[in-house]
Amino acid sequence: MEGKWLLCMLLVLGTTIVQAHEGHDDDMIDIEDDLDDVIEEVEDSKSKPDTSAPTSPKVTYKAPVPTGEVYFADSFDRGTLSGWILSKAKKDDTDDEIAKYDGKWEVDEMKETKLPGDKGLVLMSRAKHHAISAKLNKPFLFDTKPLIVQYEVNFQNGIECGGAYVKLLSKTPELNLDQFHDKTPYTIMFGPDKCGEDYKLHFIFRHKNPKTGVYEEKHAKRPDADLKTYFTDKKTHLYTLILNPDNSFEILVDQSIVNSGNLLNDMTPPVNPSREIEDPEDQKPEDWDERPKIPDPDAVKPDDWNEDAPAKIPDEEATKPDGWLDDEPEYVPDPDAEKPEDWDEDMDGEWEAPQIANPKCESAPGCGVWQRPMIDNPNYKGKWKPPMIDNPNYQGIWKPRKIPNPDFFEDLEPFKMTPFSAIGLELWSMTSDIFFDNFIVCGDRRVVDDWANDGWGLKKAADGAAEPGVVGQMIEAAEERPWLWVVYVLTVALPVFLVILFCCSGKKQSSPVEYKKTDAPQPDVKEEEEEKEEEKDKGDEEEEGEEKLEEKQKSDAEEDGGTASQEEDDRKPKAEEDEILNRSPRNRKPRRE
């Protein structure tokens, strides 16, 4: 084991020395040739700044510009709320203190912006109602073009309870933006919302019943994706809703689909009602039998069935333990208790000391009157009941009959919703500093993607440039999740442990102590080593003698001249021919039977 350790240490040390020695030799060879260049570089470094350190790429902000026709687009980079109208309404059925929509809005940069010059709409106050809206360039009509709504949200302080969704306000003669409130008719509501641990991404549209004219909200199914990160990571996220004329829809976050479906199949409640409904006037007949099982009417109670037998009986085999104190009560008055000074016997009655466990019973098996313990009665059967059998008159669970739905309609084009002419934010939030940016309403996917790349794309690039390296990210992650430190330690320690194990592992030699555990005689290790060394020395002397003899023979052969060498050369080919002939099968003698 010690030899393995020494070998590992020598290998590591030797490698280091060799590398250092090679580097030193190279430096000695080149030092005279490069001396002048080094002096010049030192002088240049004094006059020029050091640019060897890597610098993070700088992202320059430029306000996005729509590359095609849009119904609405605003990046807020002009620095004002121009075009937006603050609501002056009051919310119904709410205390006057919080009924007003008096929440503050401002246009400003993010608090920790990585893209100077990029401004957005900021919800500034908490625990207040906020409402702000803006007119579209022209109303959006649901015809042959898709509808694409997109905007950015950053929960700069996280989010405790509140929403960041937009409403597309329906085009109606009554629409008045300075009276925008929670009951203002809208066509679509879309965006993130959170309260407690319930994380939502709303897509709701109001569908008009063509028969009654009543509007009903239709909610998209919940996304399968985990939405929590979008609310907690304090990064800017891009929310996109795409509605197509074929009734399909897609919901994207950061340009990745998190939900999709069809307006006809994936909304709750469904757009179209059932063709048939249960008759509300139908009633179950009195003789309708819903019992799948009934008691057997032909069953008879057995004669030996005793319904009066108790479930428990005293154990007749039990005996009173020795030392049982029959005359001692289990509880006695506390001798140390005293009547309270404020005790009024007229009001509280006669005072009695509280009961405590009898100290004499602690050393005894029990006190008081001894009673036999109760055991299960083997003859107990309980009240007799006839066995259950299948009901021959079973008719199943009754349901009212189906009748045609008088309110049935079939709308195969729910995409053709109520036109809208404004976009608004009507929010309640317990968290301030919610940042909105780069709203766009359009019918061209290419234009929306260009707008996203020029706006949100720059934010993403700036965030990436400012992010720490891999080590920094690992440290940040471990600060949020301390158990990651264990993973890091194991990841580093495991390879080191394997290297040590490889270097130090070897076949374990038996020790003298182990030899003594067996009856077989064992040789003395030291004597064997001495004998091996003596044999090795003798072998070395013999090899030296043989080498000297061979050298002497060679010198004698050289003195004899070239005659012997020539004869030897002549004999070699002949000997080789004889050997080949002897190996040939034809020259072998037949074997006698």
Curated annotation (Swiss-Prot):
Species the sequence originates in: Canis lupus familiaris (Dog)
Signal peptide coordinates: 1-20
Key words, A-Z: Acetylation, Calcium, Chaperone, Disulfide bond, Endoplasmic reticulum, Lectin, Lipoprotein, Membrane, Metal-binding, Mitochondrion, Palmitate, Phosphoprotein, Repeat, Signal, Transmembrane, Transmembrane helix, Ubl conjugation
Protein name in UniProt: Calnexin
GO cellular component, one term: melanosome membrane
Similarity comment: Belongs to the calreticulin family.
Membrane topology qualifier: Single-pass type I membrane protein
Lineage: Eukaryota, Metazoa, Chordata, Craniata, Vertebrata
Binding site for an alpha-D-glucoside: Y165, K167, Y186, D193, E426
Ranges of Acidic residues composition bias in the record: 324-346, 526-548
Subcellular location, record wording: Endoplasmic reticulum membrane; Mitochondrion membrane; Melanosome membrane
